Amino acid sequence: IVMVTHDFGEVLSLGNRVAVISGGKLQQWGNARTVFREPANRNVAEFVGMKNLFECEVQGETALLSNGVSFLLRGSYSPERRLIGIRPEDVVLSSTRPQSLANLFYGRVVSLVSRGMAFEVVLHSKGGVRITASVLSSALVSGNIRVGEECWMSFSPESIHVFRQYIQKTEVQAI
């Protein structure tokens, strides 16, 4: 049975194999977890909601962004330009400094948008990185997280997806 949908809830609950087709081409085919957590390219990542995408230089266990901010990775990589991604639900927010020192940043909440059961929270870190988190409303209340307030954000090295190839984002032009 083939079912076509843009509803990610349906994909995750009903689909055991997922295909992402964009521009008339099969971009990725696999189980839902792999497609959502390890997208094949930027197009698939953006389509499945991986909003935190960063172009960087990877070397060893570090990803270095152009603004000097670095992320700790879950493996070791040879020096190369890459794209990395972090899903919004993997970003943890806290009004108090967490114990973790890996991928820990301090920043200001610039927007809160309701997405049903969760809120999309956009933050700008002191280092100049824009991070999007997906947070349950109860966590917003208990963490005292509001627009204009500052808070801590963190994510584990395991939550960072390092894309196999670096493909620069290009504009699609009609001919």
Please report, for each region that a protein language model flagged, where it lies by residue:
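Internal alpha/beta loop-helix hairpins
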Residues: V2-V69
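Short, surface-exposed charged micro-motifs
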Residues: E55-E57, S111, V122, W152
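Short, conserved beta-turn/loop elements at beta-strand boundaries and strand-helix junctions
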Residues: A63, L112-A118
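Short coil/loop residues immediately preceding or within conserved phosphate-binding loops
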Residues: L53, L104, A118
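Glycine/charge-rich catalytic "coupling/switch" loops of P-loop NTPases
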Residues: N67-V113, S138-I175
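OB-fold (S1/OB) nucleic-acid-binding surfaces
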Residues: L64-V69, L123-I131
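A conserved hydrophobic position in a structured secondary element of the catalytic/binding core
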Residues: I21, G30, I86, V135, ...
